[in-house]
Amino acid sequence: MNLLQKTRKINAMLQKAAGKPVNFKEMAETLCEVIEANVFVVSRRGKLLGFAIKQSIENERMKRMLEERQFPEEYTKKLFNITETSPNIDINSEYTAFPVENRDLFKTGLTTIVPINGGGERLGTLILSRLDREFNDDDLILAEYGATVVGMEILREKAEEIEEEARSKAVVQMAISSLSYSELEAIEHIFEELEGTEGLLVASKIADRVGITRSVIVNALRKLESAGVIESRSLGMKGTYIKVLNDKFLTELEKLKSS
């Protein structure tokens, strides 16, 4: 395959995604095929987002790293020193992707490191490794193209996370604002009693201790449940099982109590 055909192969993989999230494993496999190298897509914290192996490396530490999907912390931190594509790093470098304890087995091992940037910040690193053959300009063009695609995908995921967090917070705030003063007081006592995100409570006991009617507690729980903030289930004489579904709820409740 020439460079154009290889680029088209990456494009075909992207078009197949058709607006859906790009699978980092598929991206790594496509780059592995067109560049003919081992490919590792690593997050800024060393998490292995995707990888594909062209030449198997028989080393226990490497096998464990792939199973755990986590690069060593020290190595991950060092990667931040590389701010532009660094091709054909040999086995003696601290940046080599080959196991240094087996240098003799991988004397011809070469590593190429491509920073993944986006939105003005470092998002991760694309690491390529292979034996015997140097990475040429065509390989580097494909690697940098791949790193750009991965960077855009990481940014999209981050934007979705921020959006989801804002949505969760808004739902909680609306649910809490729908509670009357006595219902809010009841909810505060309920979650003091639970001491966590789920558990059993006996509504009548709380009602007696706080000095409110049981119906106030029932109404408060119903409002939170209809908003999707909690789920509750009656267990008869044992009481009511409650579980928090929205992780922003307890934080917002704590803010109200301390304000």
From Swiss-Prot:
Keywords of the record: Cytoplasm, DNA-binding, Phosphoprotein, Repressor, Transcription, Transcription regulation
A Gene Ontology BP annotation from the UniProt entry: negative regulation of DNA-templated transcription
Record carries keyword DNA-binding: yes
InterPro entries on file: CodY, GAF-like_dom_sf, GTP_trans_reg_CodY_C, Transc_reg_CodY_N, WH-like_DNA-bd_sf, WH_DNA-bd_sf
NCBIfam families per record: codY_Gpos, PRK04158.1
First-listed, main subcellular location of the protein, grouped into a coarse class: cytoplasm
Compartments reported by the entry: Cytoplasm
Annotated family: Belongs to the CodY family.
Residue ranges of the annotated DNA-binding region, renumbered to this chain: 203-222
SUPFAM superfamilies linked to this entry: Winged helix' DNA-binding domain (SSF46785)
Protein name (record): Global transcriptional regulator CodY
GAF domain: annotated span: 1-155
A single Gene Ontology CC term: cytoplasm
Signal peptide from the UniProt entry: none
Organism: Geobacillus sp. (strain WCH70)
Molecular function via GO: DNA binding; DNA-binding transcription factor activity; GTP binding
Phosphoserine sites (modified residues): 215
Function: DNA-binding global transcriptional regulator which is involved in the adaptive response to starvation and acts by directly or indirectly controlling the expression of numerous genes in response to nutrient availability. During rapid exponential growth, CodY is highly active and represses genes whose products allow adaptation to nutrient depletion.
Coiled coil: none
Secreted is among the record's keywords: no
Taxonomy, superkingdom: Bacteria
